[in-house]
Amino acid sequence: MKVLLINGSPHQNGCTYTALCEAAHARGIRVLLDGVYSHTGSDSLYFNKKGNFPGQGAYQSETSPYRSWYQFQNWPDAYTSWWGFDTLPTVNKMDPEFIKYIITDEDSVIAHWLKLGCDGFRLDVADELPDEFLKLLRDRVKELKPDAYVLGEVWEDASNKEAYGRRRRYFVDAELDSVMNYPFRTAILNFIRGRDSGKALRDTVMAIAENYPEQVFHCNMNLLGTHDTPRILTALVDDFEGPREAQAGRRLSRNQMDVARERLLTASFLQYTLPGSPSLYYGDEALMEGHKDPFNRRPFPWGREDWELQNHFKRLGRLRRDQEALRLGDIQFFQYGDKHLGFTRSYGGKTLRVYCNRSGDPWDIPAGKIVFGYSLQTVAPDWLTLGPRGFCITED
């Protein structure tokens, strides 16, 4: 397999990648790679439209080994591309040579990176990959590394997703281990911003619990922000969708920043206490803002981080690590009104009660052993008072 990297030889870069994976594993961290198998770049080894790579790409020669990967209506300039972007020619996913290159060859793309230490793949635009392709890929991954993880980019409820006229079989045929939980993000945003009640959030969570296999439900990628969405800090207060030029220079006011930061505390608390695997987009813990791509991909603000916010996320991470009920427990909602949300997480004979006060008024709740809390105003023998926009966890 040809691996082209900018600095150093493929062997040197392979060793560097393996060292990265080994260092991550020593710290209990798994490493996923982003697999984009629905299209390539036009300026790539395989298509080579600009002639920047050695060898003959599909654009350069009809005898290219990659010619069968692409759909040409009139070679070389008329070809099928991803959503009409001519810089992203679409791939024939079930082309035998493409299948061998990506999946089945001894040193296929999948095999190569798993052998170097990769722990799985996030599959870009999974809706555009045929069921047969997904099944082959996941089976090959599990053959080489049984505990590796295959995550699909799906924006809707993946259990009943229809794409290109077909009902997808992501879970029925074990094509994916899990998906990116965008419905979760939408429900959290709508609740925190007061657009929906706690009932709408509950309905979203319980619909996924009912529709997804249990093991998928508990390892869903619960996200608040990604490279495909506005920064969560921005999304919590600013709906601006004007032209790119206006987005580039748009910044939150001091008041907006204060409101967004407080809302982020609550949103992240729910992210780490509801079922699923919380995913933190780099910089969200440092108070980064920004609208859509590319303004959500700015450099990390080294030396200008919000340390209190970072410590908040560290506390949430330790909380989830230490409480099996938050990782594996059942969920039952007991409060889901316009202002308040309450649910239990139960596992192994232990029950945690989770409270979230979205309102600007105090909320009295039953007393219990405090496991985690923010904005607790009163701690009495029989009750606790959550302050405005406060949240806490108690144990019976």
Regions found by a protein language model. Name each.
Residues 1-26:
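N-terminal beta1-alpha1-beta2 submodule of the flavodoxin-like/Rossmannoid cofactor-binding fold
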Residues 21, 39, 48, 52-55, ...:
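Active-site-proximal helices and loops of the catalytic beta/alpha 8
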Residues 21-115, 137, 143:
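Substrate-binding/active-site clefts of carbohydrate-active enzymes
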Residues 24, 34, 113, 123, ...:
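Conserved, mostly hydrophobic/aromatic
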Residues 32-33, 120-122, 149-152, 220-223, ...:
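Structural recognition of the beta-strand scaffold that forms the well-ordered cores
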Residues 85-101, 118-128, 188-196, 248-259, ...:
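The substrate-binding groove and active-site-proximal loops of carbohydrate-active enzymes
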Residues 164-165, 221-252, 268-307:
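Aromatic/acidic polysaccharide-binding cleft in carbohydrate-active enzymes
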Residues 260-261, 273-280, 284-396:
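Carbohydrate-interacting/catalytic domains
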